[in-house]
Curated annotation (Swiss-Prot):
Heterodimer of an alpha subunit and a beta subunit. PSII is composed of 1 copy each of membrane proteins PsbA, PsbB, PsbC, PsbD, PsbE, PsbF, PsbH, PsbI, PsbJ, PsbK, PsbL, PsbM, PsbT, PsbX, PsbY, PsbZ, Psb30/Ycf12, peripheral proteins PsbO, CyanoQ (PsbQ), PsbU, PsbV and a large number of cofactors. It forms dimeric complexes. This b-type cytochrome is tightly associated with the reaction center of photosystem II (PSII). PSII is a light-driven water:plastoquinone oxidoreductase that uses light energy to abstract electrons from H(2)O, generating O(2) and a proton gradient subsequently used for ATP formation. It consists of a core antenna complex that captures photons, and an electron transfer chain that converts photonic excitation into a charge separation. Belongs to the PsbE/PsbF family. The keyword Transit peptide does not apply. It is found in: Cellular thylakoid membrane. It is a single-pass membrane protein. The chain crosses the membrane at residues 19-40. GO terms for cellular component: photosystem II reaction center; plasma membrane-derived thylakoid membrane; plasma membrane-derived thylakoid photosystem II. The gene is psbE. This is Cytochrome b559 subunit alpha. With its partner (PsbF) binds heme. PSII binds additional chlorophylls, carotenoids and specific lipids. GO terms for biological process: photosynthetic electron transport chain. Its main location: membrane. It comes from Synechocystis sp. (strain ATCC 27184 / PCC 6803 / Kazusa). Its cofactor is heme b.
């Protein structure tokens, strides 16, 4: 028993002027919003990642590599000082 779902065919949607008017505005706005989200630094604040100039401090220039598997808390405290 086959039938139709009552939805518009995709070809009708893509060829309509209304579709292109709406999407010619919304798609570029998504790219602009993403660019602003990253370029203003809000992405770093929202996800808690360090900014590129905060990975290394003036006192610590080496990579924070953990060596001891079972003494991680102690090593993390040393790296954070």
């Amino acid at each position: 028993m086959s039938g139709t779902t009552g939805e518009r065919p995709f070809s009708d949607i893509v060829t309509s002027i209304r579709y292109w008017v709406i999407h010619s505005i919304t798609i570029p706005m998504l790219f602009i919003a993403g660019w602003l989200f990253v370029s203003t630094g809000l992405a770093y604040d929202a996800f808690g990642t360090p900014r590129p100039d905060e990975y290394f401090t003036q006192t610590r220039q080496e990579l924070p590599i953990l060596q001891e598997r079972y003494d991680i808390n102690q090593e993390i405290q040393e790296f954070n000082q």
